[in-house]
Amino acid sequence: MKVLVVGNGGREHALAWKLLQSPKIDQVVCVPGNGGTATMKGCQNLPLAVDDFEGMSKYALENDIPLVVVGPEVPLAQGITDFLQTKGLKVFGPVQAGAQIEASKAWAKALMEAAGVPTAKAAVFTEPTAAKNYIRTERAPIVVKADGLAAGKGVIVAQTLEQAETAIDDIFQGQFGSAGNSVVIEECLLGQEVSVLALTDGLTIRPLLPAQDHKRIGEGDTGDNTGGMGAYAPAPIATPELMARVQTEVLEKTIAELRNKGIDYRGVLYAGLMVADNGDFKVLEFNCRFGDPETQVILSLLETPLEDLILACIDQRLAAMPPLAWKKASAATVVAASGGYPGNYEKGKVITGLDAAQLAGAIVFHAGTKLNSTAEIVTDGGRVLNITGLGEDFQQAIAQAYTGIKEIQFSRMYYRRDIGHCLLNEES
C-alpha cells in the first residue's frame, strides 16, 4: 500500500519512517516533505503546498494512493479531511468541525466545561478593554492566550499585570494575525506539563505513551516559548493511576461530548495536562494532531504497526484491536535549532555529520531541512533536526541523543544541553 503524508516537519519524517517499517507499506509520499524524507529509502517528496487539497487528491487518485495521513493542524482546521473524503480517499485526521478543538481555544474551553473535564478557570474576550478590566480583578501570574492557531507561540505567561496588559495589546494589535481576534485569559497553574496523545475512531479512544516536552528556548526552561526543544517518553510523572483517571475524566468525556455535538472525531486527540505536585491535574489545551517533538519519541517506542492503528481509527474498529505493544525502553529527543529561533534566523546553512550521528546510534529526524541545488542538505526552518536516542533507561536514552547531536554541525546551530535534566536528577 502507498501512503501520502501531509507536512514537512520532524513529526512527518517520523510518521513516514514508522510507516515504512511495515512490510505492508510500499511507498510514502510526503507533501511537501523535507530533506530527510527526500533522502529516505521508500519515500519521495511531492512539491505541493499543504493547502493544495485539489492537487493532493488528484495525485493520490492518479497514483493509486488510498490513504492520507495529515500531520499539521492548519490543513485540518482548513478542512483537508472533509475535502479528501469527498474524493473517496481514507484520511487520518479529524474533520474541520472536530479540528476546532485546537483551532479555537475558546471553543475547546466551552467543550471542556460542557463535558465536565477538569480545566483551568478562564474567560474569553473579543476586545482589549474588557480583558484588561478582568485581569485587574485577578492576580498575577496569569496566562493570556490568542484564541486561534499561532504555531505554539500564542501563549503568554504574564508574571505581572503590566505584562498581561502588554500581551493583550499585542494580540489584539495583530501579533498573531487572525488568531488574535479574541483572547482567552486563564488562571496560571503550577506543576509539570504532560502530553497525552490518544488515538480515536470516534467511539473508542486509546492513549499512547505519555510524553513530556521542553517548550522554552533556554536551558533551565527559560526564555521564549517554542514549538518544543526536546521531549522524552514514557513520562514517569504520568503514573498508571493518573493515566486511568485521564482515560475516564478527560479522553472518554471529551469524545462523548464531541459525539453529543454531532462531530465524528477520528484521528489523534492530544491532551496537554498540568500535573500538580499532589497528583491532581487539569487540561491546559487540546490539539487535533500528533505532537511535535513528542511523536518522535512515542513512535520510536511503538511496536504495533502504525498503519494498523490508523486504519482501525478510520474504519471505526479500534475496539477490536489488541492492546498496543511498546518497546521496554526509554526515548529522548533533542532539537537542533537555527541560531536566533524562535525569533529571526537564517536559512540555507549546509548540514554535516548526519551519517556519523546515525552511526553513533541516534535516529535523526529532519524538520526544517531541504536539498539545495547541488543536493546538499541545508537548513530551512527554525527547528532543524530532532536527534533521538533509545536506551534501557533515561540516562542511556538521553546520552544516546547527545552523542548523536555532537556529530552534527551547521552554522549557528543551537540546542539545549539539559533535555531530561529533571529525570537524571531522579534516577541518580
List each model region and its residues.
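Active-site "cap" helix and flanking loop/linker of ATP-utilizing ligase/carboxylase catalytic domains
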Residues: 247-269, 287-359, 372
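Internal nucleotide-binding/catalytic subdomain
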Residues: 154, 158-295
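ATP-binding N-terminal substructure of ATP-dependent carboxylate-amine bond-forming enzymes
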Residues: 1-96
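A conserved helix-loop-beta module that forms one wall/lid of the active-site cleft
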Residues: 92-153
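Short acidic-hydrophobic, aromatic-tinged amphipathic segments that line or gate anion-handling sites
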Residues: 45-51, 123-127, 158
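Generic C-terminus detector
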Residues: 369-374, 378-428
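Short, charged, surface-exposed secondary-structure boundary motifs
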Residues: 39-41, 57, 100-106, 218-219, ...
